[in-house]
Amino acid sequence: MANAASGMAVHDDCKLKFMELKAKRTFRTIVYKIEDKQVIVEKLGEPEQSYDDFAASLPADDCRYCIYDFDFVTAENCQKSKIFFIAWSPDTAKVRDKMIYASSKDRFKRELDGIQVELQATDPTEMGLDVFKSRTN
């Protein structure tokens, strides 16, 4: 199904991998990219993948959509997790790509039922672990 604003389709695998992450916690991260006018799964991060490895894997000059299953401990010492959606749009990305990702984001997010927190990041500091922790309340 294409988005009228951007003409983007969403590959079925995008939703299937997200549901798998949500239900079975098979992955820690999912990185999506737009290719040939559709959103596709670019790579999956194993449950053991560290946050630093995930952040380092994002391209420095290209946009991506990401899902990150963030584990944390509450003030009451309870283990919890929240599913973050990250719109990665680095300052060095091409303007046209930033526009395509921005115009397709809401439509794509609607396909992924269960996102709990959304972040917009243009550089790694905007999606640091401290930012994740501050958004878990």
UniProtKB/Swiss-Prot annotation:
Protein's job: Actin-depolymerizing protein. Severs actin filaments (F-actin) and binds to actin monomers. Required for normal cell growth, plant development, cell organ expansion and flowering. Essential for root-knot nematode infection.
Q: Give the record's keywords alphabetically.
A: Actin-binding, Cytoplasm, Cytoskeleton, Phosphoprotein, Plant defense
GO CC field: actin cytoskeleton; cytoplasm; cytosol; nucleus
Extra remark: Plants silencing ADF2 show net stabilization of F-actin that blocks cell maturation and root-knot nematode development and reproduction.
MF terms (GO), sorted A to Z: actin binding
Under the subunit heading, UniProt states: Interacts with AIP1-1.
The GO annotation for biological process reads: actin filament depolymerization; defense response
- Give the chief site where it resides: cytoplasm
Please name the source species. Answer: Arabidopsis thaliana
Annotated ranges, domain ADF-H: 5-137
Q: Please, which domain of life does this record's source organism belong to?
A: Eukaryota
Q: Give the source lineage, highest ranks first.
A: Eukaryota, Viridiplantae, Streptophyta, Embryophyta, Tracheophyta
Q: Where in the cell is the protein located?
A: Cytoplasm, Cytoskeleton
Q: Which PROSITE patterns match?
A: ADF_H
Q: Name one Pfam family in it.
A: Cofilin_ADF
InterPro entries per record: ADF-H, ADF-H/Gelsolin-like_dom_sf, ADF/Cofilin
Q: What is this protein called?
A: Actin-depolymerizing factor 2
Query: Can you tell me which family this protein belongs to?
Result: Belongs to the actin-binding proteins ADF family.
